[in-house]
Amino acid sequence: MSALTRCLNEEAAAIAAAATRLEASQVDAALDLLDRCADQRAKLVITGVGKSGIVARKIAATFSSIGLMALYLNPLDALHGDLGVVAPEDVALL
């Protein structure tokens, strides 16, 4: 089996395992928050440090590309004045 095939099989298994851990109510709640962002023109503020920060930037860019106002907020910078971009109606993904 090639390395690519092994990698794809491992990724597929991880996705299948995640699907069994998610409850419909959790998915519905997350989708409701995203709907709220779209309906109220609220921002989706995504944060993370290190590897999770890299993923957070990608998630923010992906949501922005489909028309949802989303941004990456460095949590260290947030502590030093950047929280001004966050409004009460915004949704945070930590």
Regions found by a protein language model. Give the residues of each.
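Conserved N-terminal alpha-helical segment that immediately precedes and caps sugar-phosphate-binding
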Residues: 1-94
